[in-house]
């Protein structure tokens, strides 16, 4: 039964990966076409372009790894498996930092706080986006190198077999590996939660101001608040189980876990990127309009 459930999870992950690849290819092509036509690109579209390329490569690598894992009859090469893990970890970390940067940009541009820090960020964040994107890549490279260093210093735990189940002896090296992975993702989580909280607070202030002035509170600024807030909240809903599942998959003793746990981790790890990419298309006016035109043309 568990074997069938695991096989179903693999099929579901392959389908979701195909969806994610198509969605991110669409995001990349639309933004690239706009960039070539107008010879300029907005800060948010520049981030989306980088995010689309990164996720396209990441999901493609994940799909190749899944197909190779299922179709391979012989034992997998340790070096090839390590290559897949490290490339995926780097691309995954880069894409998460790109999303974090996108949420920061939305928060700074849409909120109407008059604090000097926010006013300074409003003026300076857009010209700094290329450098911030490079910083995201460098942070991801550093995180991946840190993972390599700690995993080399952390030997695989020895299996301790009992009559009922199999347990693992977790040593201090593995605990340091877990701590490094948690710390690398906790900063992203804190920034994203803070951005969403500031957006919600700004939206509440905006609605109160509109009500006090006896005017309709649903205007373009309110719509921008709500759209960005929805994207951030849905991102967090997808991101939290995804980060837990991915953390478990990176641990050395993941290979010894039962198929039920592996299946759940696989589904949560695969659902995030395609789901968030679809949300980006739905909430982005230009991408949404282009997608509607393509669907209407096909009909």
Swiss-Prot record:
CDD domains: 7tm_TAS2R4 (cd15013)
SUPFAM superfamilies xrefs: Family A G protein-coupled receptor-like (SSF81321)
GO process terms (BP): detection of chemical stimulus involved in sensory perception of bitter taste
Annotated keywords: Cell membrane, Cell projection, Cilium, G-protein coupled receptor, Glycoprotein, Membrane, Receptor, Sensory transduction, Taste, Transducer, Transmembrane, Transmembrane helix
Disulfide bonds listed in the record: none
Major subcellular site: membrane
MF-aspect GO terms: bitter taste receptor activity; G protein-coupled receptor activity
Other facts: Several bitter taste receptors are expressed in a single taste receptor cell.
Record's function text: Gustducin-coupled receptor implicated in the perception of bitter compounds in the oral cavity and the gastrointestinal tract. Signals through PLCB2 and the calcium-regulated cation channel TRPM5. In airway epithelial cells, binding of denatonium increases the intracellular calcium ion concentration and stimulates ciliary beat frequency.
Membership in a protein family: Belongs to the G-protein coupled receptor T2R family.
Descriptive protein name: Taste receptor type 2 member 4
This protein's encoding gene: TAS2R4
